[in-house]
């Protein structure tokens, strides 16, 4: 007796080739770096801003900017210098679940080298990723940074480059608003930089110095004001005032007791 199998029927007018059956595997991308990272950090915008500003800062030297997703923190070849931007602001877009979020804790790593004999230098750059806390996968969206944000970050890079490679002093770093602490908790378990041991959600040293200077100037007494005038205000916590308020309280209690006894 033959068994009827409808899936073996073939139409003489239309024959579709058989498809090989393969198992479906659900796998979440890990924090390992891949080549897609190079295309997601708007390489052309970074190079455009960097080349324009370096042409103004050092027109006699030739510099190149390379996106290197395999760059390691504190792992430097001889002659190379390092600069880390700890508090950049960027927008992440998850290509898996389409979740989008803004992060003020974006970490960018730079390695710099200058060949003085050839008058040529090279900068390698890596933008650390963050995992999506909705599904566990994320990549940096191409429209993650505005042009003015990139310009500020490049200014800081060039300031560090001139200090470390050229021995110049007197540069000023731009302290981004994102470097200030906010109410949002940074999730280190989803951050690629945190997983590699880069602590960056705390205020940077530049920010702490700025706040300490502001605090010192704002709290320092005025030099034109005499010393005896600084304590001439009304101090309601002094001993005479404490005795006065105690007397008033006892008087109120005495009046209340007298009123109750009369009733």
UniProtKB/Swiss-Prot annotation:
It is a single-pass type III membrane protein. It comes from the Eukaryota. Residues 260-263 are extracellular. GO terms for molecular function: olfactory receptor binding; zinc ion binding. The chain crosses the membrane at residues 239-259. GO terms for cellular component: cell surface; plasma membrane. GO terms for biological process: detection of chemical stimulus involved in sensory perception of bitter taste; protein insertion into membrane; protein targeting to membrane. A zinc finger (3CxxC-type) spans 88-197. It is found in: Cell membrane. Pfam families: Zn_ribbon_3CxxC. Keywords: Cell membrane, Membrane, Metal-binding, Transmembrane, Transmembrane helix, Zinc, Zinc-finger. The keyword Membrane applies. The keyword Metal-binding applies. Its main location: membrane. Residues 1-238 are cytoplasmic. Specifically promotes functional cell surface expression of olfactory receptors, but not of other GPCRs. Interacts with olfactory receptors. PANTHER family: RECEPTOR TRANSPORTING PROTEIN, RECEPTOR-TRANSPORTING PROTEIN 1. Belongs to the TMEM7 family. This is Receptor-transporting protein 1. It comes from Macaca fascicularis (Crab-eating macaque).
